[in-house]
A protein has these predicted regions:
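Alpha-helix-loop-beta-strand connector modules within alpha/beta enzyme cores
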Residues: 36-43, 47-48, 53, 96-121
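An N-cap/entry alpha-helix motif that binds or orients negatively charged groups
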Residues: 3-67
Length: 137
């Protein structure tokens, strides 16, 4: 089953990432950031009667590559202008072709909350999300 395959790949990837960026350092960096980033995710979703979260996604296991040319910052800016309450950014690299840089750059560009979308299996990834600029996971 594809989900099992993705979870197993995620376990391997997270173990490798922990060798590059030590968990204690990532946790310390996350905890050193302000607890209120100015992008309260829940508040953004409660601002109107109808809200939407738009997704920035380059590929999926079922569809393959969705966008060969992937102007992720332009896409995110267009979502914000269109009235999105938040933006979901794929960071899973193997099956969705996501990248932490997409999250980092989008989070530093838009004024609405940004969600890290990945297969979260370890608290390490939660601290990564905070360091990378995510408002939610």
């Amino acid at each position: 089953m594809i989900l099992d395959t993705i979870v197993e790949a995620t376990k391997i990837r997270v173990a490798q990432e922990k060798q590059v960026e030590m968990p204690e350092a990532v946790k310390a960096a996350a905890l050193a950031l302000p607890s209120d980033t100015g992008f309260p995710f829940e508040a953004a979703l409660r601002q109107q009667d109808f809200n939407f979260i738009c997704e920035v996604k380059k590929a999926s296991p079922s569809k393959g590559i969705i966008a060969e040319h992937f102007p992720y910052l332009d896409i995110a800016k267009e979502y914000e202008v269109a009235g999105a309450a938040a933006i979901s950014v794929l960071t899973e690299p193997d099956f969705f072709k996501g990248d932490k840089k997409y999250l980092q750059e989008i989070a530093s560009t838009v004024k609405i909350p940004v969600l890290r979308k990945d297969f979260i299996i370890d608290e390490y990834q939660i601290y990564q999300a905070k360091v990378w600029g995510a408002s939610a996971i």
